[in-house]
Amino acid sequence: DFTKDIYINKDKIREDEDFVILYKGFLFSNNLTNDVYVSYGYGDTWKNKDEKKMKPSTFGYLATIDVGSGDNLQFVFRDNQGNWDNNNSQNYILPIEESQEVLSFKTIAERS
């Protein structure tokens, strides 16, 4: 479950798209550090695990995540002093939807 301290800029995340995550959790609110990272992977086994340093802002920490394939994206936050925000050891989880290929067709008459 998400808390009021984590926001994303899309209603749903999809394969092969990116999204921005805004973190305002205790690592930000307690001002413990200037360096916060988001660690993430796909599925229960954290396939293709990656980590990004988040950019500080007055609103929280920001990162853009390029979504790969999997059923869900699991992620946690950490700082450079060994403090973690991992949703009480449950991780934060977002379901991933398959990419939606949009095709646009025109009649031959419209192409002339």
Question: What are the functions of these language-model segments?
Answer:
Residues 1-112:
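Glycan-association/targeting regions that enable binding to alpha-glucans and other polysaccharides
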